Amino acid sequence: MVNVVLGSQWGDEGKGKLVDLLVGEYDIVARSAGGNNAGHTIVVNGVKYDFHMLPSGLVNPNCQNLIGNGVVIHVPSFFEELKSLEAKGLKNAKGRLFISSRAHLVFDFHQRTDKLRELELSGASKDGKNIGTTGKGIGPTYSTKASRSGLRVHHLVNDDPQAWEVFETRYRRLVETRQQRYGSFDYDPEEELQRYKSYREQLKPFVVDSVNFMHDAIKKNKKILVEGANALMLDIDFGTYPYVTSSNTGIGGVITGLGIPPRTIKEVFGVVKAYTTRVGEGPFPTEQLNEDGEKLQNIGAEFGVTTGRKRRCGWLDLVVLKYSNLINGYTSLNITKLDVLDTFKEIKVGVSYSVDGKKLESFPEDLLTLAKVEVEYVTLPGWEEDISKITNYEDLPENAQKYLKFIEDFVEVPIQWVGTGPARDAMVHKEI
């Protein structure tokens, strides 16, 4: 049985907290897309664990963890993150953590060219804005993957006597191509080659054929939780292109990023922040560049775990959520950070878009259209009381329940969990 946790907006919805809540019930936690370009924090017994690339199922000592073929891996960061987690007391990680042999490798030159490409794109764009990359080399790695010139984990750990020679040749070809494209840049390819050579033996114990790994687990009726990265509105196909990440962050990426058939997926949990945030550039129809936006930012402590960048803030956009549900097919929702709205007298919710007075029937794919949309809001009464100590759904203020019911009715998906505060256990469960 496979269940999936996916972000429904532009990321930073609080997926990690739900995974943290659920992980004790699962035998395996898997990641299917992205790299170390996203992050979340999990608190266990007062200890904070920061996750970027590694599956957060590592906090459960009885859980196996898989980094799937759809993930791109910067090997130095992999070991640094593992070392950091172990230094905080995480035990037996090495026997419970596995990497797909088909996952592509991120190199330092990918990270250098990521930043150069960002400058190039911002200089060529009409408004001078950039995509807002994290600079982790994710996009350039997926680019080499798509062009069939990338290097995968199995290329690095292959025991064939000629394997390292082939690896070196392909690696140097990749570097030369980028030097031809961008000229000379601060980078020592020979040093990185030797570093990766030293990683070969260290990495081998982690590497598995992930297709066999997953299908063997499914055959044995193991409970598997897939931990989504980023969110649907950052999906390379369905997000606000080009202000997106470079992988499929929706349900399709789970299937291709782990090599599992759709019929194995039972539940899809959509994680929804009670308002909306976005990091970096790109369309954001319900953004509030005013006192309300600042209030959401300050109360919600909206800063990125990976980049530290301030998040843009606005009201909940149900047009986005409904569109997200069309693609991902959520079986239930987790509304997070509802407590951030505790002090608002009135709360607005975006329910439709129009351009030049004409209502749009669906979420627009074109940024020129999206830039012109006028958002129609419904104003709901706030509850103006602290909900952080509430443990039962029925004890939530009446207006808080009405707010949640409005979301359920609009999207036509039941809400199963509600985040009521920053504490690990500040989550109300609702029977569905």
Swiss-Prot record:
- What is the cofactor note? Binds 1 Mg(2+) ion per subunit.
Subcellular localization, per the record? Cytoplasm
Q: What is this protein called?
A: Adenylosuccinate synthetase
Q: What Enzyme Commission number(s) appear in the record?
A: 6.3.4.4
The record's SUPFAM superfamilies line, in alphabetical order, gives: P-loop containing nucleoside triphosphate hydrolases (SSF52540)
Residue positions annotated to bind substrate are V305, T306, T307, G308, R309, K310, R311
Quote the pathway field. Purine metabolism; AMP biosynthesis via de novo pathway; AMP from IMP: step 1/2
Residues annotated for Mg(2+) binding in this entry: D12, G39
Its Gene Ontology cellular component terms are: cytoplasm
Active site, renumbered: D12, H40
Record bears the keyword Ligase: yes
Taxonomic source organism: Kluyveromyces lactis (strain ATCC 8585 / CBS 2359 / DSM 70799 / NBRC 1267 / NRRL Y-1140 / WM37) (Yeast)
Q: Which SMART domains match?
A: Adenylsucc_synt
Task: Look up keyword Cytoplasm and say if it applies.
Answer: yes
Q: Which InterPro entries match?
A: Adenylosuccin_syn_GTP-bd, Adenylosuccin_syn_Lys_AS, Adenylosuccinate_synth_dom1, Adenylosuccinate_synth_dom2, Adenylosuccinate_synth_dom3, Adenylosuccinate_synthetase, P-loop_NTPase
NCBIfam families noted in UniProt: PRK01117.1, purA
